[in-house]
């Protein structure tokens, strides 16, 4: 999802964590954010409220030599998602660039669950020794509560660069996109009872034989799967000569109605002439008179 640089909002009523030194690591390392106190969370839980992050600020202040090189990567994860889908936003910037990172959430969370957001950093391609205290991080967090969730307009991540020798061309940031969805049709009671099916859909590499089923669908309750009778599935292994049913009945009927006799134009004229001559000859013979007796 594309993002752009915009001025970050002014901070007020933020929960601030301590500005702590962190060691350089090539592996993801957590930056602990300060969330509302347990008492505040219990109060919101008793009022049956849900919460969201309005705004999160991550302040990065480097403390490395001027010839230090490398890239710092900061990531925000939502632990309600599976591990390979938990990443929500990320930033990359030079290790010597003092910077403020701004993140805006687009979802609510329940206080009955652990607070899902985790903040991590790692450093790549650096000439600074690992385990060196290379920078200080500080997190500022603003949350809000609501009786129920509502649609939240999307706001892209932003940055505020505090080092004059760097610009937005040296920074990159990313935000997760909306999840994919597709319409799923509901099976009616009648179609489920009698095993009725829709039309067969033939996909590339398939044939009618691989998709044709006979009889009602049997459902395996133990495995929760539908068992189909597909007697023609293996027919594609046979040769085309065996499977070819021949010409259709309509083509055969047309062929039977067609004559194999061919005549030239002169032969046709001669046939017509002789036929006409015979007709004239027959019609011109006088009838035998009847005798009067």
Swiss-Prot record:
Disulfide bonds: none annotated. The keyword Oxidoreductase does not apply. Pfam families: Gemini_BL1. It is a peripheral membrane protein. The keyword Nuclease does not apply. Changing residue 35 to A: No effect on subcellular location. Reduced levels of infectivity and very attenuated disease symptoms. No effect on NSP relocalization. One of its GO terms (cellular component) is membrane. Keywords: DNA-binding, Host cell membrane, Host endoplasmic reticulum, Host membrane, Host microsome, Membrane, Phosphoprotein, Transport, Viral movement protein. Phosphorylated. Belongs to the begomovirus movement protein BC1 family. Binds to dimeric supercoiled plasmid DNA. This is Movement protein BC1. It comes from Squash leaf curl virus (SLCV). The lineage of its organism: Viruses, Monodnaviria, Shotokuvirae, Cressdnaviricota, Repensiviricetes.
């Amino acid at each position: 999802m594309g993002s752009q640089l915009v001025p970050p909002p002014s901070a007020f009523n933020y929960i601030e964590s301590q500005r702590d030194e962190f060691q350089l690591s090539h592996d993801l390392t957590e930056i602990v954010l300060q969330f509302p106190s347990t008492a505040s969370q219990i109060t919101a839980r008793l009022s049956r409220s849900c919460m969201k992050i309005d705004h999160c600020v991550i302040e990065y202040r480097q403390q490395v030599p001027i010839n230090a090189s490398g890239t710092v990567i900061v990531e925000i994860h939502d632990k309600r998602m599976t591990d390979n889908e938990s990443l929500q936003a990320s930033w990359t910037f030079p290790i010597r660039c003092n910077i403020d990172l701004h993140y805006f959430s687009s979802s609510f969370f329940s206080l009955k669950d652990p607070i899902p957001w985790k903040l991590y950093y790692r450093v790549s391609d650096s000439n600074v020794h690992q385990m060196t205290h290379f920078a200080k991080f500080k997190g500022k967090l603003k949350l809000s509560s609501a009786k129920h969730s509502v649609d939240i307009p999307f706001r892209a991540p932003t940055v505020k660069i505090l080092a004059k020798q760097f610009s937005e061309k040296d920074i990159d940031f990313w935000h997760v996109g909306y999840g994919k969805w597709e319409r799923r049709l509901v099976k009616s009671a009648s179609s489920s009872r009698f095993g009725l099916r829709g039309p067969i859909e033939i996909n590339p590499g398939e044939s009618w034989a691989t998709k044709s089923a006979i009889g009602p669908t049997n459902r395996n309750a133990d495995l929760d799967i539908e068992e189909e009778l597909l007697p023609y599935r293996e027919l594609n292994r046979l040769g085309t000569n065996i499977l070819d049913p021949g010409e259709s009945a309509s083509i055969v009927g047309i062929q039977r109605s067609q004559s194999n006799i061919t005549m030239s134009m002169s032969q046709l004229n001669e046939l017509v002439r002789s036929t006409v001559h015979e007709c004239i000859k027959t019609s011109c013979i006088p009838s035998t008179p009847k005798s009067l007796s």
